[in-house]
Amino acid sequence: MKKSFLMVAAAAAMLVATGFTACKPNSTPKEIDIYVAGYENSGTEDAAKVWKNGKELYELTDGSKDALALSVFVVGGDVYTAGYEDNGTNKVAKVWKNDKELYELTDGSNNAIASSVFVADDKVYTAGYEGKVAKLWKNKSATDLTDGSKDAYAYSVFVAGSNVYTAGYENNGTNDVVKVWKKGSEHLVLTNGSNNASAYSVFVVGEDVYTAGYESNGTKDVAKVWKNKKEIFHTDGSKNATANSVYVVGDDVYVAGSEGGVAKVWKNKEELYDLADNGGAQSIVVHNGDVYVAGDEKEGSTRAAKVWKNGKELYSLADKGGAYSIFIVER
């Protein structure tokens, strides 16, 4: 089952653009720029947007048709954004570079969404779906991860060296099954299909593949994280919960998601921050020990797009909107 975007981390947990290496001792911390992808509703439809340091950077669509920006990746001063724009009949998967459309990945004949973007070696990798098929695009060239006989979706893509990892789900005829693909082929099957489950985020360190998502226990959705094939984190199952984004620094595993409608961050299986009593934590990045999260919080009858730093609100981006992906670049 394709999950509502208001509660999905469509973006992959993003690395800091300068790499994973920690700052050298006694070095002066560099200033950073914080990029966020999401949407704002200022009329009848959602407009795809990118913010930089709390201010609107790009309005990717004009708001005349429904659109979302679900993932952002910055490299070499260029801002790549993945999402979709409705054509009046179906959703069309798209990638933008800076404020211009770069790729229209699908022709609009079937519903399609680009959920995650990752740029490596001047190649643009995008994960998503078209129709019932989970897909991975390299620039504009598509690879079908599934055969289309059952519903499937690729939510997250991560490139590590020459390996391209994609995470999502494929239905087995009864329930959705968590899967990770590597170089376009099935790599890990993380649930047995007895209950619905999905992966929303994949993060790779060396040979270790971390996957975040959820698995139903039959009555409630349980937030889960797997390291390779082993489950390493789960909520207690008393409330609906999901792990939307995972980020790893050394031996520390950070997770953003929600439990019982509360936006939360966990670190090494323990709750670290309770961000909002009625909200969702969609994407997480850790930089120089600081924890940055993009998501949304319900305020009155609407949801507001937010960024938190170390558990405290840093930016309110849109009074009516949502934030799905965060990316940090050192200046």
Can you say where each PLM-predicted feature lies in the sequence?
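Residue-level hotspots at or immediately adjacent to binding/recognition sites across diverse folds
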Residues: 29-331
